[in-house]
Amino acid sequence: MTSNLEAQLLALRQEGEKAIAAADTLERLEELRVNYLGKKGELGALLRSMGQMSAEERPKIGAIANTVKESLQTSLDQQRVALEAAQIQVQLEAETLDVTMPGIYSPQGRIHPLNGIIDRALDIFVGMGYTVAQGPEMETDYYNFEALNTPPDHPARDMQDTFYLPDGNLLRTHTSSVQIRYMEREEPPIRVVAPGRVYRRDNVDATHSAVFHQIELLAIDEGLTFTDLKGTIKVFLQAIFGDLPIRFRASYFPFTEPSAEVDLQWNGRWLEVMGCGMVDPNVLKSVGYDPEVYTGFAAGFGVERFAMVLHQIDDIRRLYASDLRFLQQF
């Protein structure tokens, strides 16, 4: 009985190795694996007859069976590797693309000067503890004007021409509307900076555009003063322009009181770079804040203005022309 089963196992190994070597597809190889090593395969069928053997015969046959199984598994693995390699080679030969050829060079992109200013400014304010907030560019009259202490009959509305839409909404004229929406959602203390596109009915020339970018900041807390505002602006401008002289001039904005313009001495002359002021109590009331408890300050600047000063650009239209000869300088 032992010698007969031993001969059958050796014959099975020989037959299996021959069949595996002849397999020419991965599908055929899988069929052979199931046929020889599967639960209902030929090796399993032979091993089930070991139950008729004596206890002395089983160890010898078991060792032979393990050897046969390992040999067949090794043959299967080797043939699988060979077939997969052949399959890849056929695929490569069939493809029209030669993967060994050098690729097509794609020139590295550059950061647009406007995006560079925005990223730099936001990094500075985030480092000072401010949160970045976004809002809709199509706004309601309430958020763009009324909540900012500019009712319908307020003379300050004559200061800026607005793009009104047929449904009564408008294209925002500043990102201050984002601050109102943010204050409605959050409780003080607040430190928020709002970047984004704004729209005004300006005639397009070297220094004006109907669409441009603003960044505005807002801080609301107990005990904030104009000194805090000045300190914040000085830190920001020094981080952008370096340690240059700065001055504050009295000005007027409907949503701040007192208000000021910020000038920077650049190349021997004073340049207006920002507007700022203490948040008007009426604005605080419109969002449900108690002006007897909280005070705040706000400031804003045009991104295009900063880009033109820093990069000595003489025409704002260059920033939108998509002229690679110009943009590759940055």
Swiss-Prot record:
Binds 2 magnesium ions per tetramer. GO terms for biological process: phenylalanyl-tRNA aminoacylation. Mg(2+) binds at E257. It holds the Pfam family Phe_tRNA-synt_N. One of its GO terms (cellular component) is cytoplasm. Its EC number is 6.1.1.20. It is found in: Cytoplasm. InterPro entries: aa-tRNA-synth_II, aa-tRNA-synth_II/BPL/LPL, Phe-tRNA-synth_IIc_asu, Phe-tRNA_ligase_II_N, Phe_tRNA_ligase_alpha1_bac, Phenylalanyl-tRNA_Synthase, tRNA-bd_arm. Keywords: Aminoacyl-tRNA synthetase, ATP-binding, Cytoplasm, Ligase, Magnesium, Metal-binding, Nucleotide-binding, Protein biosynthesis. It is an enzyme of class 6 (ligase). Tetramer of two alpha and two beta subunits. This is Phenylalanine--tRNA ligase alpha subunit. The keyword Transcription does not apply. It catalyses: tRNA(Phe) + L-phenylalanine + ATP = L-phenylalanyl-tRNA(Phe) + AMP + diphosphate + H(+). Belongs to the class-II aminoacyl-tRNA synthetase family. Phe-tRNA synthetase alpha subunit type 1 subfamily. GO terms for molecular function: ATP binding; magnesium ion binding; phenylalanine-tRNA ligase activity; tRNA binding. The gene is pheS. Its cofactor is Mg(2+).
